[in-house]
C-alpha cells in the first residue's frame, strides 16, 4: 500500500464507449469519493457552441464563450445531472449533433486548456475518480492510480446503442459504430492531448468482460495503490 489517509486521483482513460463513465460512477458511489465526468464537460461546451452558432474555427468567439460558461454536475436523487448555465442539459449533451462535434471541439487548444484548468481546480483537496481521454497523461500525470480501458469498436457501439435506448435516444447502431471509429481516429491522432496509454497505466480490454468483472479487476489494482476505504 503506497498511500494512506490522503487525497488521491484515480485516472480512468480509454476509448469512447469502453465503460469508463459507468465504472467511475460505480467506484465513486460505492466508496464515497468524488466522480468527475470530463467528457460531459466537453459536451456542455459543444452544446453551448451549437446553441450560439459558433464554429470550431471561430477561436475568439469560443474564448469569449468560455469566459462566461458555467458547467455544473449535480446529484438528483441518485442520478447525475449536468447543468449548463443553470439549465439541465443531461439529455441534450447526448444528442447526435453533439456526438458529431464533441471530438473536434475537445481538440481546440483553448477549450482543452480551460477544461484542464477547471478539472485540476475541482480536484484539489479531494479523493476523486476522473475519466476521460488524457487524465493520466496530461491532466494528472502524477495520479496515484492510472487505468486504461479498451474494447472492440463493435462492442463499444453496441453498448452505446443500448445506453441510448434506455435514455430514449434513438440513434441507429450503424451510425453509432461509424461515430466510434471516427472518434478513435480523431482522438488518437489529435495534435492536442492525443488518446494514449500512460506508461504506468494498467490496461484492460473490456470486450469480453461484464461491467461487474471489469470493476472487480480494476478495484484489485486500485487497492494495490491506495486505501480507498479510508
Report residues per predicted region.
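P-loop (Walker A) phosphate-binding loop of NTP-binding proteins
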Residues: 15
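Hydrophobic positions on the alpha1 helix immediately C-terminal to the Walker A/P-loop
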Residues: 23
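ATP-dependent NMP and nucleoside kinases share a basic, alpha-helical "lid"
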Residues: 90-102, 106-166
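N-terminal phosphate/diphosphate-binding loop that engages ATP/GTP or pyrophosphate donors
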Residues: 30-95
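Residue-level signal for inorganic ion chemistry
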Residues: 39, 86, 115, 129, ...
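Hydrophobic anchor at the beta1->P-loop junction of P-loop NTPases
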Residues: 10-12
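Conserved lysine of the Walker
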Residues: 20
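Small-molecule kinase domains that catalyze NTP-dependent phosphoryl transfer to phosphate-bearing small molecules
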Residues: 74, 119-126, 133, 137-138, ...
